């Protein structure tokens, strides 16, 4: 799968990139904020976006809306440490492909990726 990473934390970005590559996926772009995410999506046309929920400037929810304005079928995995039922309901209502909770294990990540195929 071709993946765009949208995450402001360099260590988390590095970790997700390494796990994706270990599982045979291609990271086609990285972004740290909303404008870079939308630009990266438009330029790279990824199969899926890993999107942090809390980013500088715009929230992940706002960026999700921006991505869907570019491509209503955009597949997005939200990455977050926030555990709230209301957030989960909102994300599910917005049609995210999955929610990846931080911290996560390799097995958690592998299972998530297997379910996305």
What are the functions of these language-model segments?
Residues 10-29, 94:
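Two-component/phosphorelay signaling modules centered on CheY-like receiver
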Residues 30-48:
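Acidic, metal-coordinating helix/loop segments flanking the phosphotransfer/catalytic sites
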Residues 62, 83-100, 111-112:
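Alpha4 helix (beta4-alpha4-beta5 surface) of REC/receiver domains from two-component response regulators
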């Amino acid at each position: 799968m071709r993946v765009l990473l949208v995450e402001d934390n360099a260590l988390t970005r590095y970790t997700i990139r390494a796990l994706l590559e270990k599982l045979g996926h291609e990271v086609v772009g990285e972004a740290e904020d909303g404008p870079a995410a939308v630009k990266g999506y438009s330029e790279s046309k990824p199969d899926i976006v890993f999107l942090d929920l809390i980013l500088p400037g715009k929230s992940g929810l706002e960026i999700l809306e921006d991505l869907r304005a570019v491509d209503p079928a955009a597949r997005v995995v939200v990455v977050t440490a926030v555990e709230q039922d209301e957030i989960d309901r909102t994300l599910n209502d917005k049609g995210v492909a999955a929610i990846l909770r931080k911290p996560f294990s390799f097995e958690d990540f592998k299972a998530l990726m297997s379910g996305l195929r």
